[in-house]
Amino acid sequence: MEKRYKEILLTNEYGKLLEAKKKGIPAVPCLPVIYAENPITAGNEKIMAKEMDLSGYPYVLEQEEEVEKAYLEKIRCRLLGLPCEILQTRRCIVREICLADVDNLYEIYADPSITLYMEGLYAKKEEEIAYTRDYIRYQYGIYDFGMWIIEDRQSGEVIGRAGLDLRPDREDAELGYMIRKNRQGQGLAYEVCTAILAYAKEEFGFEKLFARTRKENLASVMLLKKLGFHPVCAQSETKEADNAQIEYYIVLP
């Protein structure tokens, strides 16, 4: 069996998998994998089965299963190192980050108001690039979600970030968001976050999400309340009361 999805080869023949690997063609094994369809070599299948190694293939499909086009597209993006599109709203596209976005992020984070209530980027761009490369490989590759890029649907301009993050001590995910200074006040964060809440429930089965913000960050507080979040408690209380974070939660319908 041999099929093509755009640049991706899908086959149950081990010989064709090896050939594709030599040529640099991204391929996906389809179970059950045999050594070859050729009846002349088919008699060696039992011997060859011991030598077949599929450990280097991050995706393996069942030959008979019906695979949705959206899943094949995600596999394609993963194998080719392309950012997957997550969702679209009326004005925005939400997609995974790629290394080409790093320059845009430094431009956005250069405005002091962006880092007033959140961490900035690495001081050295090469460190941010290395971090982003690992984030793509491990965060997206393992969990299939994370912080994403927000693009303007019409212009393609990177206008912010939003997404879901996991904390080591929590089972529920944290909602995060950031819109560049010159695009704030247009309802974009609400538009994108509303779509992400629905996506979190539908795609990953999250029943509850949380978010944290500083109490003096009134725009963020108002956004969370508008989204339906409820305050839990103040965290990280110190002598500097202004540094206290308030945690909010939402039970997804």
Q: Regions from the language model: what does each represent?
A:
Residues M1-L9, G15-I93, I97-D103, I108-D111, ...:
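Acyl-donor (CoA/ACP) binding surface of acyl/acetyltransferases
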Residues E13-Y14, D144:
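Conserved glycosyltransferase catalytic-site signature
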Residues Y109, M118, Q139-G141:
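Hydrophobic residues in alpha-helical segments
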Residues S113-Y135, F145-G146:
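Conserved GNAT-fold acetyl-CoA-binding loop/helix
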Residues A130-Y131, Y135-R137, Q184, L188:
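Repeat-unit-sized solenoid/scaffold elements
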Residues Y135-I149, G160:
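A short helix-loop-beta-strand connector motif used in the catalytic cores of GNAT acetyltransferases and
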